[in-house]
């Protein structure tokens, strides 16, 4: 612990209760560093300050603690719920176990009548009315399923605003992925049947679908409707192809299977999802964990995952190690999601197969991550030797714009586990002279560190000038930050970078230096993040700025134009006659728009 805070901390530890509750670790300025729960507050909190702690993350946390606050609860379940609420509210830096905490992807069937749409999105949108299917472990797997649904059942996936404006079928109809309900080329009854079949497919009811398609194909052939028979035959072939690729189990029901593994400082949790007897896939997580007991670590991960990331919990959670607080976690999940949840570590038959599959995947994933982890640790170690101080967290800023247009500042965050994408931030720069990178960097740094905690190393891309400006910002904010400026070498070639320090010294690392490789990795990621966000902002601005120059064309009609033609490129390609079709434009405005866009 910090030596200045030792007397105060020791006094707190001596007076701690042995009741269950929640504890909060606070930093020098009173900022919340970490929230934890405990069955026995005295034992748990005191364990952070024993000399045998070896985990670097725990050591870094303890070194920053200046104060501790506790809240006593009536039970461990209550402590768990309170802990997760505090984490969700404050997002303490040492509680963030998941580097990328995006919600899972779900496939959604809307309740729009008479022509529902099928789409995908992250999380269960509470503003949406309809049916959700999932979770899918990645956007790719959800898109793959949507593509199959398009080919099988031709259900629309377009936005309602686009759908309502159509006057003729779009490209999806031409390539046989939509039945064009927008222009009435399919009856509501036939479309409803396609939607219901899509839902049955998503629910895993493919056996009956198979039989129905066979019956329809045979009936069409008997009626000498050979085109229709070929249509059903093609659908049947595609359905069987999809079935062959899916892992389908005889046991119905829903379950998440979680397997944890730990090796050489790397923790991996593999989650597999089974819904309606179908394996939807899985995802590997590499959380930052404080602890050395696998059961407790998995329990902490599950609390974090199901309370902070997941939109739902299945009725059954199968784990590869017993949890010390299984009952408390079951009760907390039941309260949170309003359903009974069972956590099982001893299973047989099909469930044992699921668990074996998850364990096989977690071992495979941790081996792949381990080599990356060891290389990254070595890079951090060499950088620590170069700068002469311990480094756990690095933040790097970059500015991106096109001739001063749509400036964006990015901030990326790395620690010894790699990129912390959930900590990334972007800043839309405003009210500066176009192209003034110094002013842009000043604004970004000021906005970031007015509230956020300083990292162990702040990398400034831009060299000596930007570094001096950053020093001024820190002085104005009353902060002491360890900063290094990075300037590119002659010809801006990688490997010739120079590091500038706040005391005026500078060094140039050899091209094969692992410390240099880490700096390049962080800087390049900051550049990638900045330029990606800048291009999106620039393109969005350009798509509307051309239309904004047209007199008499207000925001609503600009929006209608873009919606009708699918974007600015569609508007530019449209003829004068096609422009008149847009509701509310009329011939005069259509002629004006066409003339201005094509002068």
Curated annotation (Swiss-Prot):
GO terms for molecular function: DNA binding; excinuclease ABC activity. GO terms for biological process: nucleotide-excision repair; SOS response. Transmembrane segments: none annotated. It is found in: Cytoplasm. Pfam families: GIY-YIG, HHH_5, UVR, UvrC_RNaseH, UvrC_RNaseH_dom. The UvrABC repair system catalyzes the recognition and processing of DNA lesions. UvrC both incises the 5' and 3' sides of the lesion. The N-terminal half is responsible for the 3' incision and the C-terminal half is responsible for the 5' incision. Belongs to the UvrC family. This is UvrABC system protein C. The lineage of its organism: Bacteria, Pseudomonadati, Pseudomonadota, Gammaproteobacteria, Moraxellales. The gene is uvrC.
